[in-house]
Amino acid sequence: MERSKKLKEAILQRTDEIEEDGYHQAILNIMYEHWQENAGSYKDTIEWYKNEYGELAQFAVLIGKYNQQVTNGGHLQYYDNGYADEKSGFGGHHDPDIPLHQILTVLFSQSGLRDMTSTAVFNILQEFRIALDTTEFLEEDQYDEEGNHYLDRVNNDDYGEVINTQYLSKLDKAYYEICDEFMKILEQYFKEKITGDKK
């Protein structure tokens, strides 16, 4: 409860930001400022934000980054840039178990957002998964100088790459159809949480 009160006080001091960009963005801005000043990992920053301001702040950031990444480059970008796991940053090896995304899904389920649009978004969040190519080596047909056939074992250039991109594209399309409406719902949700005003 104390952390929730601290978040409310911090946000209500940002009247210019609220007027220009809204309550949700004001919540995100606190995290961004800390992240830039401390240059820690995304995971560490999210953990700091939760410890400092509570789960509402954590939910605001996780759902905000999800929306930004998916609307910018789809669910594949969300994964590739590391916002679904604990290793932010493009490239590298990201965790296909997407632990931060799993936290987002749990927080969403506890949020009380039950309207039709939010329920559709929650379903998309639950359906998001990553499948990687786990075949490290391939066998290729080869022939020796005398024409005898043999199989040669070669490296698979796609080893570790995401292979369910068509599935992810379907999730992208489903989200794009409702994301604008969902952002309006989220803004009202965070406004109510900060101010208590249901109008």
Please describe what each predicted stretch is.
Residues K6-L7:
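Long, low-complexity intrinsically disordered regions enriched in Ser/Thr, Asp/Glu, Pro/Gly
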Residues D97, H101-G112:
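Non-transmembrane, aqueous-exposed alpha-helical and coiled segments at domain scale
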